[in-house]
Amino acid sequence: MFLQKIVLYLSTACMFCYMLGKFLMLVILQFFSPSLAKKFILRMGEKITMTQNPRFNYEDWGLTFMSLAFIKTASSHMWLSLGEEAFVGGEAPDSPVVTMDREKTSISKYLKGNRPLVLSFGSCTUPPFMYKLDEFKQLVKDFSDVADFLVIYIAEAHSTDGWAFKNNYDINQHQSLEDRLSAAQVLVQSEPLCPVVVDEMTDVTTIKYGALPERLFILQAGKVLYKGGKGPWGYNPAEVRSFLEKIK
């Protein structure tokens, strides 16, 4: 795990520098050539499904990538990711979660024998997570005979009182477990076809899995079998499908 941690620290440092560089470039471009800045942002938006999402227009989200709220939120996500302990081939962190009935449990309770367990971390205010919910639901339908699925609701990616997008779900960042359960209930209404639990307010599970703002994992027999990239770029249900097809 030592080498994996070193790689994690170095990659996070590189990502932080990249984020700052991109931010400064966009701010400068916006000042001298707003049309060119928009072109760059739309290209980025295509990679994270924002331009494909019918819920949003460019004006709802594009300019927020040049805001201090973006820097603050993205930096916080990177800082928390340094506590990541879930690595492919290693032990899956058995961290605590809370059911929708307010019962404390843990990740391992959802592992059944040698069946794979797909974990999907996310929140309603994360547009790519919600945009790909139907794709995730199709995974549940197609592979429920060989695998189990669990959605873990975590801190809001784009809370109304944080890095907010217009026309998004109106949910403030959670100040209590009741807030988080209430937000998760919004997701439950979309019928994800599998159990939904929430992370504790310490965000311990989110941190150990490096899950902000969204992420996919496959666990089996207490080990990490598959670890998707960090969202929004790395949240890819198609990769999970390919992985499960090999073991079906």
UniProtKB/Swiss-Prot annotation:
Catalytic activity: 3,3',5-triiodo-L-thyronine + iodide + A + H(+) = L-thyroxine + AH2
Record GO terms (molecular function): thyroxine 5'-deiodinase activity
Active-site positions on this chain: 126
Record's subcellular location: Endoplasmic reticulum membrane
Keywords, sorted A to Z: Endoplasmic reticulum, Membrane, Oxidoreductase, Selenocysteine, Thyroid hormones biosynthesis, Transmembrane, Transmembrane helix
Domain of life of the source: Eukaryota
EC number: 1.21.99.4
Membrane topology category: Single-pass membrane protein
CC per GO annotation: endoplasmic reticulum membrane
Ranges annotated as spanning the membrane: 7-29
One biological process term in Gene Ontology: regulation of neural retina development
Family to which this protein belongs: Belongs to the iodothyronine deiodinase family.
Function in brief: Responsible for the deiodination of T4 (3,5,3',5'-tetraiodothyronine) into T3 (3,5,3'-triiodothyronine) and of T3 into T2 (3,3'-diiodothyronine).
Name of the protein described by the UniProt record: Type I iodothyronine deiodinase
Source organism phylogeny: Eukaryota, Metazoa, Chordata, Craniata, Vertebrata
Underlying gene: dio1
